[in-house]
Amino acid sequence: MNKPQHHSLIILGSGPAGYTAAIYAARANLKPIMITGMEQGGQLMTTTDVDNWPGEAPGLQGPQLMERMQKHAERLDTQFIFDHINEADLNQRPFLLKGDNATYSCDALIIATGASARYLGLPSEKAYMGKGVSACATCDGFFYRGKKVAVVGGGNTAVEEALYLSHIASHVTLIHRRDKLRAEKMLSAQLIKKVEEGKVAIVWSHVIEEVLGDDQGVTGVHLKHVKEEKTQDLTIDGLFIAIGHDPNTKIFKEQLEMDEAGYLRAKSGLQGNATATNIPGVFAAGDVTDHVYRQAITAAGMGCMAALDAERYLDSLNQA
């Protein structure tokens, strides 16, 4: 095995948490290395309108915000490595990370790997992935211009996807397993307006039992009522999955403490260690540890705290 590339501080992930950590770490002269992962920019790269970023009164696009963050980190001489880490050994010092392209070691590690879209888990869903089934309306919505589509879910992501698609598709159906939305009130109100305009329909209290299709792709979905013995088929050309996310923490299992859903557990912060994990020198920031707030601004704030925590930790090593 080639000798690992050693760095004082490595940041895994390139979303708001990772970029903010890089900015603060660079300003502290920690010479941070960011390993971007496969999806540089994180979930915001597939978010159309960011209307709640402080100071951006007109609003801006998700990719636009991430580009600004990247340029900010670049200006401060953050080094970017385009690689995907698939194995981590946090039980040795320095920490060891194995990627697709190289092996790395570091004295301190900030994990900002975020979360990925969750799928229904149906064999038929997997069979039509990329052939009518998608988890990203902003990525694939264009292909359904003038066609009928459905979105499954009831939270912010599902409503945002439905609203976005309502400007492209001929008709959008939102399928939700509950009898009310979990999305923010403002988003829900916007969706109800689309329903009143006839551009969107909502199918309450139903789940998808099967994705229907042929050699060309998706043709519909088979739905079942969650309480009653009723089923129905819905004819659509595309299905967008928006039922939540799973944290990207698989490579850290049995090393770092996690909750039952796989989110990393961080300390309380009462002693200036808000992002510290159970392993000294390893810090967590953003959606990889937060499944409650899950906002760009909170992820960025945690990235800031992780950099400050890492700085204190590295200082303690130098003083030892």
From Swiss-Prot:
Q: Which reaction does it catalyse?
A: [thioredoxin]-dithiol + NADP(+) = [thioredoxin]-disulfide + NADPH + H(+)
User: Where in the cell?
Assistant: Cytoplasm
GO molecular function terms listed in the Swiss-Prot or TrEMBL record: thioredoxin-disulfide reductase (NADPH) activity
In short, the EC number is 1.8.1.9
Primary localization class, coarse: cytoplasm
Note the superkingdom of the native organism.
Bacteria
Keywords of the record:
Cytoplasm, Disulfide bond, FAD, Flavoprotein, NADP, Oxidoreductase, Redox-active center
What's the top EC group for this one? oxidoreductase
- What family is this protein classified in? Belongs to the class-II pyridine nucleotide-disulfide oxidoreductase family.
Q: Per its record, how is this protein called by name? A: Thioredoxin reductase
> What organism does the record attribute this protein to?
Coxiella burnetii (strain RSA 493 / Nine Mile phase I)
Gene symbol here is trxB
